[in-house]
Regions:
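Glycine-rich beta-strand-to-loop/alpha-helix junction loops that act as flexible
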Residues: 205-206, 235-244, 272-274
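Active-site-proximal beta-alpha core segment in soluble small-molecule metabolic enzymes
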Residues: 68-234, 256
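Charged (often Lys/Glu-rich) extended helix/loop segments that serve as interaction or gating elements
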Residues: 256, 270-425
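Conserved, mostly hydrophobic/aromatic
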Residues: 52, 75, 104, 160, ...
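N-terminal capping/small domains of soluble enzymes
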Residues: 29-109, 115-120, 363-376, 380-382
Length: 425
């Protein structure tokens, strides 16, 4: 059964796995602000701070209505030059490494909750002076390092990650509840360990999904872990909540959180990553060559790379949106007649990897050398994951504020040969 405010038919099914964004929304973005107008060499990422703040206001509304604590999952986005636009709205950050903890402390400056599948002694000694919550993946790790917690001069809330053995994520690479999952403790395992010193639980089972998925997940969490829910002080519902996407059921989310908090009298955390920066960033690239292919589709080579600069395109895989173009997604579309006034291209990357193809697209007019191409939704899992494979220059990082008359464009970082060389020796 669903709460009255949760629409089962409205649940979201992984937007980036080839589900197109509304084309009018893309055109609206393109007409409001020209993200390709920055006077620096391409490629570059450009983050719209006005869009960041709009997303933050949505998260802040959930916090106000539920008294929950929403964290930024730094694994998805760690571009700290815009943390000043995020920190006023959020409770803190969710970190998974020493580097993320240090960056969160230095640049975000609020609560830090840490989880990793395993810790070393040196890592914990480095982070314990800085963190507020520490989640262990196993009882082995907690028992090994609890002496460090006791020796700390700060109050550290310790929790266990649990595995409800339920996830609606279809892609196995993103499903944390498979039979071979390394994440969290199953109910029968938790039954056999001591909870002494543990005051919280954490689960993460979702990816780009709606509040109805959380509702169904919590039903299983309660069924399998209820005896522990009455003994703890806090719980983390993890990430994967697509709170800022159009049509997300915020009323449903708030009802779910409030009902759970009232029933168990717990502090509730959420740690979305993508939701914070959804539809806030773009990757601008330049056409270097247009190659005629008499037996297939003409190929456009850009000065960017799926493998190096937008790795989820290869990893998921998915086909990113391009402003003012249409993706060719279905296999049945590959050889379809061109629409009147439409030009079809394979968009390829600059590396020597044969499979470094971004996708197939239809454009309103033919592309030519020097044209700039704008990829949408490029804040999350790009700057924190990109590489200099094949010696490619990393895209620059630019911020703007589309709510101001001049756009307040700031070039935050450009990368040079020295950045490539110093990483290698």
């Amino acid at each position: 059964a669903f709460p009255s405010c949760v629409n089962p038919a409205a649940w979201y099914n992984v937007v980036r796995l080839n589900r197109p964004l509304p084309q009018d929304r893309l055109m609206e973005h393109a007409s409001v602000f020209n993200y390709a107008s920055v006077n620096i060499d391409t490629p570059y990422y450009i983050i719209d701070r006005a869009a960041i703040r709009r997303n933050m206001e949505i998260h802040a509304e959930v916090e106000r209505r539920t008294d929950c604590k929403i964290l930024l999952a730094m694994k998805a986005f760690s571009t700290w030059s815009v943390f000043k636009d995020m920190a006023p709205y959020l409770a803190g950050v969710a970190a998974s490494s020493v580097n993320e903890v240090f960056l969160g402390k230095e640049e975000f400056g609020k609560l830090i909750q840490m989880y990793s599948p395993a810790y070393s002694e040196d890592e914990l000694k480095a982070v314990l002076p800085l963190i507020d919550y520490l989640v262990f993946n196993s009882a082995n790790q907690y028992e090994r390092f609890k002496y460090l917690i006791k020796e700390s001069d700060r109050k550290i809330h310790c929790g266990y990650r649990i595995n409800p053995e339920y996830s609606e994520v279809q892609m196995e690479i993103y499903n944390p509840c498979t039979n071979r999952s390394r994440f969290g403790m199953r109910a029968e395992v938790l039954q056999e360990v001591s909870m002494r010193g543990i005051d919280g639980l954490h689960f993460h089972t979702m990816c780009q999904q709606g509040s109805d998925v959380l509702f169904r997940t919590l039903e299983l969490v309660e069924e399998r872990f209820e005896k522990f829910l009455n003994k703890i002080k806090w719980i983390n519902f993890g990430g994967g909540h697509h709170i800022t996407r159009k049509g997300y059921d915020i009323d449903g989310l708030c009802e779910i959180i409030n009902t759970f908090k009232k029933k168990y009298e717990l502090d509730v955390f959420l740690e979305p990553g993508e939701s914070h920066v959804l539809h806030t960033g773009y990757l601008v690239a330049t056409v270097l060559d247009v190659i005629e292919n008499p037996t297939s589709i003409d190929v456009v080579i850009l000065d960017t790379s799926a493998s190096a600069h937008m790795p989820d395109v290869i990893e998921m895989p998915y086909t990113p949106e391009i402003l003012s173009a249409r993706r060719v997604l279905e296999s049945s579309d590959l050889d379809m007649p061109l629409e009147e006034g439409r030009y079809k291209y394979i968009i390829g990357s600059k590396t020597c990897l044969s499979g470094d193809i971004i996708g197939e697209y239809l454009f309103r007019k033919p592309l030519k050398v020097g044209d700039r191409v704008i990829f949408a939704d490029m804040s999350q899992y790009t700057m924190c994951k990109n590489t200099m494979f094949n010696g490619l220059k990393l895209p620059g990082i630019v911020t703007c504020d589309s709510s101001t008359p001049d756009g307040n464009i700031q070039v935050v970082r450009e990368f040079r040969y020295e950045d490539f060389k110093t990483r290698l020796s």
